[in-house]
Regions:
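Positively charged n-region of N-terminal signal peptides that target proteins for export
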Residues: 1-4, 88
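Sec-dependent N-terminal signal peptides
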Residues: 4-13
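Mature catalytic domains of secreted/periplasmic carbohydrate-active enzymes
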Residues: 19-441
Length: 441
């Protein structure tokens, strides 16, 4: 523990000496965000009408001008912000991050600083972000905004390797000064109008290359000035860039990867931070972020619970994505899954919310979280594993299952090896079991 504290202090000091030090509000907001542990990502936009996923413009090789005309057919008549928030809250999630503007460049709010490519010029016309912000405030759910740095619609955006594949007959200008002015105008609108907790960037990776095993940034986004602009408005910054963190970034993001594991292939060369919150994002409709009608593979509630727990055991939040359809409804399969996840949280939430990594475990079979120095939670995720031993400093005051409170047998040897054995009748319910152990010196 002391070693971890020394490392964290050293890193904080390094940030100060480098010329940047987060303000008190920023540090407190980071801590509050980390304590939430579970959020819901929402990818939604014009692509929902196509029902082919959020990258359909690029992967389907559509003409951008033809694609953008879907704006005139976007009328999600079933959209109900309060219903969305109810589903999220009942699932045990503490925050929502929604795509205010994805790579296709369409804005889900009536922005005044674009060329009219936004919700105000659809048949629907209603301010989606405004309604969602109001519903979140009513229910105590934090709202964050995903914002794409990459833009397949605007001609002043300096095209990277991916944007250059978009079919478009208009002439490119590649004027970053103009594009940055546009982005800052939109970001100011988002923060001043809706008061999000976080601006969550994506798309910087379009201008990055791996050279000799290291990431090389091939475009100067002037992100320090953008981050300062956001921080001046008391809003946190996250950037899903698959690269080492910058000092002004408040949250480290891992896309479809647990910190340090790189199973999804996006995190190669991305060291895990020691001094800032971490968030892993993943999908409930297994292979897409935006709604895709042909994708019938959805994660089970047990899958989601295991992902939440494994993330928390690595000091990370989990941001689980749901892609609403063109009518504005969450897929029924996702709603059913999240309802079951919520039941688990009602019983076991204390083992996730406000916890830190427990520091003991056995691969994916047993992981742990903790609160303070005296409470440890063991999560038995593999039904075949019912006994776990680890070194413990101190003595056990009590040990019991969170679900039902049944006592759990523990044996502590003279050399400090604690063995925890699940009751035979309580070894598997599909979601694993959580043992709460209270310890003392």
């Amino acid at each position: 523990m002391k070693k971890c504290m020394i490392i964290a202090v050293a890193l904080a000091a390094a940030a100060v000496f480098a010329g940047y030090a987060p303000e008190v509000w920023n540090i407190e907001a980071r801590k509050e965000f980390a304590s939430k542990r579970f959020g819901v990502f929402i990818h939604w936009g014009l692509y929902a009408n196509y029902a082919q996923g959020e990258w359909y413009l690029q992967r389907g090789q559509l003409d951008e001008e033809a694609y953008s005309r879907m704006m005139y057919g976007f009328c999600p008549s079933c959209f109900d912000a309060r219903e969305w928030v109810r589903i999220v809250k009942d699932a045990g999630a503490k925050y929502i991050t929604i795509t205010s503007r994805h790579h296709d460049g369409f804005s889900l709010w009536p922005t005044k600083v674009d060329d009219g490519y936004n919700i105000a010029n659809t048949p629907f016309k209603r301010d989606i972000l405004g309604e969602l912000a109001a519903a979140c405030r009513e229910e105590g759910i934090q709202l964050n905004f995903y914002y794409s740095l990459m833009d397949w619609h605007r001609m002043d955006y300096p095209a990277g390797f991916l944007t250059k594949t978009i079919l478009n007959s208009r002439e490119r200008k590649d004027d970053y000064a103009s594009y940055k002015k546009f982005m800052l105008g939109q970001i100011a609108e988002l923060i001043d109008s809706y008061r999000p907790g976080i601006i969550w960037f994506d798309g910087e990776w379009e201008h990055a290359r791996e050279i000799d095993g290291k990431f090389t940034r091939t475009h100067d986004w002037q992100l320090d000035s953008i981050y300062d602009f956001i921080h001046e408005r008391r809003t946190l910054v996250a950037n899903n860039n698959h690269q080492p963190m910058r000092e002004r970034e408040d949250i480290q993001l891992f896309e479809r990867d647990l910190p340090g594991e790189n199973e999804g292939g996006f995190s190669k060369g991305q060291p895990v931070t020691l001094d800032r919150p971490i968030e892993q994002c993943d999908v409930i409709q297994k292979n897409v972020w935006g709604y895709k009608i042909a994708e019938k593979s959805f994660r089970s509630a047990a899958d989601v619970v295991a992902m939440v727990v494994r993330a928390a055991a690595k000091d990370s939040n989990l941001l689980m994505n749901i892609g609403p359809d063109g009518s504005g409804q969450f897929p029924a399969e996702a709603v059913a899954t999240m309802a079951e996840v919520g039941k688990w949280f009602k019983v076991n939430g204390e083992s996730v919310y406000g916890t830190r990594a427990g520091g003991v475990g056995k691969g994916k079979s047993v992981v742990s979280t903790r609160k303070g120095a005296d409470i440890l939670y063991l999560h038995f995720l593999d039904p075949a594993v019912n006994v776990f031993s680890f070194k413990l400093e101190g003595k056990v005051v009590s040990s019991a299952l969170l679900d039902g409170g049944k006592p759990v047998d523990t044996v502590l040897t003279a050399d400090g090896l604690l063995t925890v054995s699940l009751p035979k009748t309580e070894r598997s319910n599909g979601f694993g079991r959580v043992v709460k152990i209270r310890v003392a010196d």
